[in-house]
Amino acid sequence: MPEPVAEPALNGLRLNLRIVSIVMFNFASYLTIGLPLAVLPGYVHDAMGFSAFWAGLIISLQYFATLLSRPHAGRYADVLGPKKIVVFGLCGCFLSGLGYLLADIASAWPMINLLLLGLGRVILGIGQSFAGTGSTLWGVGVVGSLHIGRVISWNGIVTYGAMAMGAPLGVLCYAWGGLQGLALTVMGVALLAVLLALPRPSVKANKGKPLPFRAVLGRVWLYGMALALASAGFGVIATFITLFYDAKGWDGAAFALTLFSVAFVGTRLLFPNGINRLGGLNVAMICFGVEIIGLLLVGTAAMPWMAKIGVLLTGMGFSLVFPALGVVAVKAVPPQNQGAALATYTVFMDMSLGVTGPLAGLVMTWAGVPVIYLAAAGLVAMALLLTWRLKKRPPSALPEAASSS
C-alpha cells in the first residue's frame, strides 16, 4: 500500500476531482473490457463458425485470468508502488487489442484465430486486475487513507460507466471496421491511458515488511465472505431478471436493469461520506437490510411495479456494500499489506459472481425463477448476521486471525 503524501485536508469538489484523475485509468481498463463484450461471442459463433461453448469460453477466459491474477496485483502494488502496476495493467489492455488484431489477420485459419482471441482475453484479464487494483491504491495514496471508501466508490462508478459505454461503442466500431476496427479502438484507448499515466507523479511504496499471504487472508476472509454472500443479490438480478420478466409475461426487463444501475451509481454519489460518518460495518448492515427487502419484493412480485421497486432497492442496498466492508478489510492489515488485502477481498466477489449464475440456474430449473430471489435474500441475511458478528468481535480477536498473524 502506498504511503500518502502529507497535505492539507481535501474535501468536496477538489477531493472528487483528485480521485477521478486517478480512477480514470480504471475507467480506461474497463472500457477495453466493455468494447468487445457484445461483439466477440457473435464473432466466434457466427463469423468463425465455432459452437456456443467456445463463444462463451472466449469471454470467460478474461474473468478467470482476472480472478487468478488479482492477488498478485495487490502484492506487486505493495512492493513496487501502484503507478507501475497501473501502467503494466494498461499495457496488458493494449496487448489484448493487438491479440484481436492478429486474430483478424489470421481469420483464414480458424484455430489460430481462436487461440489469438483467447490469448488476448487472458492478457486483458491480467491487465484489468493490475490496472483496477493499482488505480484504487494510487488514488488512496494521493488523497490519504481517510478517503479510501470514497476512492473505492468512485472506482465502482467508473466501472459501471465504462461497461455501459463500451458495449454499444464496440458494436459501432465492429460495424464500422470489423474486428480490426474494434481492435484498433481497444489499442487506442489503452495507449492514450498509458500516455496520460506516465507523466503523473507516483506515490511511494511502503517499505515495511509484508505479512505472508496466509496472514492477510486470515485478516480479511470474513469480510470477503460477507461480500460474497451479498453479491448473490447482484448476480441474480444481472443474470436472471430478463428470464424472470419472461416467466411472468411482463415487458420492461431492460428498464429494470437500468433502474438497478441508476440506483447503484446514484447511491454512491448521494452518500459519499456515509462510510466515514457511520463506520463501514454499520453502513454494510443498513445496506444488507435494504437489499433483503428489495430481493423479497422481486421474489414475491405480483405486479411489474413491485419488481421494479425491488430491483431499485436491491441496487441501492448493494451499492455501498463493497466500499463499506472494503474499508474495514483494508484497515485490518498493516499499510504495507493493504494492496494484498484489497485484492484478496475483491477475489471473494469475483468468485461469488462466478458461481452464482450456475447455482441459481440449477435452483431455477428445480423450483422456478422467483425462488432464486428469495434464496438470494436468505444469503444476504446471512451476510447481515456475519457482519453483526464482526462488529461485536472483530477478526483481530478471532482465533483464525490470531493464528495467521
UniProtKB/Swiss-Prot annotation:
Q: Where in the cell is it found?
A: Cell inner membrane
* Family as reported in the entry's similarity comment: Belongs to the major facilitator superfamily. YhhS family.
Q: Which InterPro entries match?
A: MFS (IPR011701), MFS_dom (IPR020846), MFS_trans_sf (IPR036259), MFS_Transporters (IPR050171), MFS_YhhS-like (IPR023008)
Q: What is this protein called?
A: Uncharacterized MFS-type transporter YhhS
| Organism of provenance | Salmonella typhi
Keyword Cell inner membrane in record: yes
Q: Give the transmembrane ranges.
A: 19-39, 48-68, 85-105, 129-149, 156-176, 178-198, 224-244, 252-272, 283-303, 309-329, 344-364, 366-386
Q: Which GO terms describe its molecular function?
A: transmembrane transporter activity
Under the heading CDD domains, the entry gives: MFS_YfcJ_like
Q: Its membrane topology, per UniProt?
A: Multi-pass membrane protein
Is Ribonucleoprotein among this UniProt entry's keywords?
no
Q: Which UniProt keywords are given for this protein, alphabetically ordered?
A: Cell inner membrane, Cell membrane, Membrane, Transmembrane, Transmembrane helix, Transport
Gene Ontology cellular-component terms listed: plasma membrane
| PROSITE patterns reported for this sequence | MFS
